[in-house]
UniProtKB/Swiss-Prot annotation:
This is FAD-dependent monooxygenase notI'. Belongs to the paxM FAD-dependent monooxygenase family. The gene is notI'. SUPFAM superfamilies: FAD/NAD(P)-binding domain. It comes from Aspergillus versicolor. Coiled coil: none annotated. The active site is at R195.
């Protein structure tokens, strides 16, 4: 199998066929990375198009390193073209008093791309389509199966076979129980998130709501408001063509009727709500979602008994949004799996999947812990006593400087020993005490 300097191999040259279920950020990245490594890819997504709702997503340097190999840089160029055009990040208290204004230059922020979640998915999906990969949208997988030599899915009563199956269908995964026998309870974290994104035309003619467009000027703006047990973020994207907002509460307060009405109620006693409410109230009802937040340790067993199926992304290790790493870690999962398959080869697919789990587990567990700490920081602001009572390093090197592909080359053999001989090992990409 010929491999070029970037690590890319000729299409379908490895002899390995990979079925991927779920085309969120993790599944899309897995499909693209597996294709880059010479594997044949078959994709299934139950929705007729990629998932649209959400707010902003931040592609950080640890994931951007993976994307640099896609399309000779064309995917990174697309991220740069659609990233938020910001010059400052502003922090306010619940009265609307500006507490902090930090410089931000989207064109100089090293390997850090903030953009609409739906735009990111569109960019990934379009790149995948350009690769002429076998993609089935609006297709439900009803069953999973494996033998000693193959694995597959059942779709429309038909069994489709491959060398391995990647289950990347999210935190409420339907495939996970069939891959791992481990119970996967999702205890709530006593927290709720509300997220919205809509076109700026919804507020453009309303003088009480369009103030944010004036604040954005020729570019975009990003404002965060902190109160006790509550944080509100809002701003613009794609040169103020879109409005986004999100609200995080430490309480479980899922909306009984309208998510917008629930958020307006949550911020109702904030003095600044008189400024925020007209904007929030313009949100189209189908452009807002509410979610109970979950966190738990990663699934202990990502790989099926016969080693032919693996769970990746939020299906294996859900993150709180405060970690800012959900999609980024899914991208890392994808890159590590594809490379492990390339190194192990067709005869050792089960080993590749088990090595992937070993290389990834400690890192995602550490990042999950950081997400809880970040949540506690953001929801425990006390402006009367100096603001943040807890402070985390914004861009720790162990997290953002990690090169997951380099790690595979350096630690593959150690992970093999951990899998085959039961060696206890510490792997890279985690904080050093």
């Amino acid at each position: 199998m010929a491999i070029d300097a970037s690590g890319a191999a000729a299409p379908n040259s490895s002899g390995i066929t990979v079925i991927i279920v779920g085309l969120g950020p993790t599944g899309l990245a897995a499909a693209i990375e597996c294709h880059r490594r010479g594997h044949k890819v078959i994709c299934f997504e139950r929705n007729p198009k990629s998932y649209r709702l959400g707010d902003l997503i931040n592609v950080t340097g640890n994931a951007a390193r993976v994307l640099q190999g896609w399309g000779n840089g064309s995917v990174i160029n697309d991220l740069q073209a659609f990233q938020c055009n910001l010059d400052t990040l502003e922090v306010y208290d619940e009265t609307g008093d500006l507490k902090l204004s930090a410089p931000y230059n989207a064109n100089q922020a090293k390997d850090n791309y903030m953009l609409r979640r739906s735009r990111l998915l569109d960019i990934f999906l379009q790149h995948l389509k350009n690769l002429d990969v076998d993609i089935h949208l609006g297709t439900e997988v009803t069953d999973y199966w494996e033998t000693e030599s193959s694995a597959g899915v059942t779709v429309g009563g038909k069994r489709i076979a491959a060398d391995c199956v990647v289950v990347a269908d999210g935190v409420h995964s339907k495939g996970r129980p069939q891959v791992s026998a481990e119970p996967f309870d999702l205890p709530s974290t006593d927290g709720t998130a509300f997220r919205a994104f809509f076109h700026a035309s919804e507020i453009a003619q309303d003088p009480e709501a369009s103030w944010i467009l004036q604040d954005a000027g020729e570019g975009d703006c990003f404002k965060t408001f902190y109160g006790k047990g509550l944080v509100m973020m809002l701003g613009t994207a794609e040169n103020h063509e879109y409005i986004f907002w999100s609200c995080g509460s430490k309480e479980n307060v899922l909306a009984q009727s309208s998510a917008v009405a629930q958020v307006l109620d949550l911020i109702g006693d904030w003095p600044v709500s008189k400024r925020l409410a007209p904007l929030i109230s313009k949100t189209p009802s189908d452009n807002c979602l509410d979610q109970t937040l979950f966190t738990r340790s990663p699934l202990n067993k990502w790989v099926s008994r016969k080693g032919r199926m693996i769970v990746l992304g939020d299906a294996a290790h859900p993150f709180l949004p405060h970690a800012g790493q959900g999609a980024n870690q899914g991208i890392e999962d994808a890159a590590v799996l594809a490379l492990c398959l390339q190194i192990a080869g067709k005869d050792d697919v089960p080993l590749a999947l088990r090595v992937t789990e070993k290389l990834r587990y400690q890192r995602v567990a550490a990042i999950q812990k950081r997400g809880v700490e970040a949540r506690d920081q953001s929801l425990s602001v006390d402006w009367e006593n100096g603001g943040f009572t807890k402070k985390l390093t914004l861009y720790p090197a162990w997290l953002h400087d990690q090169d997951c592909i380099k790690q595979v080359y350096e630690e593959f053999d150690k992970a093999v020993a951990a899998v085959t001989k039961g060696h206890e090992c510490t792997f890279g990409g985690i904080p050093v005490d």
